[in-house]
Regions:
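Charged interaction patches that mediate protein-protein contacts
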Residues: 1, 205-209, 322-326
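Outer-membrane pore/translocation modules
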Residues: 25-33, 89-236, 242, 262, ...
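Short N-terminal helix-initiation segments at or just after the protein's N-terminus
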Residues: 40-43, 204-208, 246-251
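N-terminal signal peptide c-region/cleavage motif recognized by signal peptidases
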Residues: 14-17
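Residue-level signature of outer-membrane beta-barrel architecture
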Residues: 81-89, 134-138, 194-202, 245-249, ...
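Outer membrane beta-barrel transmembrane domains
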Residues: 221, 226-326
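Short glycine/proline- and aromatic-enriched beta-strand/turn motifs that initiate or cap beta-hairpins
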Residues: 20-118, 326
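Sec-dependent signal peptide recognition
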Residues: 2-11
């Protein structure tokens, strides 16, 4: 659901090539800072269960005469859920239950330069990341709850540069020596979050209003090039309206349900800068079989699909829609 990082290297180089200039030390430092933000953003986007995966495309002209397009594929497996039924919190009129969360993801990003001396070159990013954690959901009444959680995430990001242009082939070794391309970096991320939910029941239809604020603190601990180190903070704020509608039709002994959600996620810090995306909207629809009465099994299984859009980015995803009850 987010836009992939475009080739910052080619954008900066092309603006200097047109004037016959070299990259200064300060500009090289600025380029590396932007690359670090891209690593931070792609790692989070590649695995965080709060951000949707899918197929994404973006294009534009970041600098005059520097047209580019970018394609990104994000595959994720994971999610989160509440464990058991709410228990009383001492003598207080508050219920509580554990929350578990986890996700793993893979991201592949290809950035194509479409104009100038570097036309035909491509900068590619690959990300593998995994996260796990949990917290406690506190029920203030039967409808309103709040869940503080903490997760940890490990990620590995690698970059390769396909020098197809004459200029690229002649200079790619210099790019590599400067640590601009062809590197690997390992990162860890701490992810505290606060989720607020309100449930509405209309006959048998369930409406869930939620607001999820997340903070990310990311640092690298290993890199193939000493010039590539990552330290950054990011944030996201997701607001969602989810509707679950029972259809009263049995299939294989289970009731058929439909529904979906509409959400808007604001991005902040390195996540916004690295993806060059301010927000992402998502509309999702699903058709599932209900397993609601069976604990420690899927709550529902079916199919679902989403369309996502935001600043200069579009995306889509279709797949198996599963929710578990523990």
């Amino acid at each position: 659901m987010a836009k992939q990082a475009f080739s910052l290297l080619t954008l900066l180089l092309f603006s200097h090539l047109a004037a016959g200039q070299n990259i200064s030390g300060s500009e090289l430092g600025q380029l590396r800072d932007t690359q670090r933000a891209s690593v931070e953003a792609l790692t989070i986007f590649g695995a965080d269960f709060g951000l949707s995966g899918g197929e994404f495309h973006t294009s534009g002209e970041r600098l005059p005469g520097t047209a580019f397009s970018a394609d990104m594929s994000v595959n994720k497996f994971g999610g989160g859920g509440d464990v058991g039924a709410p228990q009383s919190l001492g003598t207080l009129p508050i219920g509580w239950q554990p929350v578990i969360q986890g996700s793993m993801g893979w991201l592949d990003s290809t950035n194509h330069l479409e104009t100038g001396p570097l036309k035909g070159d491509a900068s590619k990013y690959s990300v593998y990341a995994i996260q796990f954690g949990g917290g406690i959901r506190f029920w203030l009444n039967e409808a309103l709850s709040v869940a503080p959680t903490v997760m940890g995430m490990y990620g590995r990001t690698s970059n390769t540069y396909d020098a197809n242009s004459l200029y690229g082939r002649e200079n790619v070794s210099g790019f590599m020596q400067r640590g601009i391309v062809d590197w690997e970096v390992d990162t860890w991320t701490v992810r505290p979050a606060l989720d607020l939910q309100y449930l509405l029941t209309l006959h048998r239809t369930i409406v869930t209003l939620s607001s999820d604020a997340v903070f990310f603190d990311t640092e690298s601990f290993s890199s193939s090039n000493k010039s590539m180190s990552v330290v950054g903070t990011s944030g996201s704020w997701d607001n969602k309206l989810d509707v679950d509608v029972p259809l009263g039709v049995l299939v294989l002994g289970h009731e058929l349900r439909t529904g979906g959600y509409l959400s808007r996620t604001e991005l902040y810090g390195g996540l916004r800068n690295g993806l060059d995306v301010k927000y992402i909207n998502e509309v999702h629809a699903r058709l599932v079989l209900d397993f609601l009465s069976q604990r420690w099994r899927p709550q529902w299984i079916g199919i679902g699909g989403s369309y996502l859009w935001g600043t200069s980015i579009t995306g889509w995803t279709v797949g198996v829609d599963v929710m578990f009850r523990f």
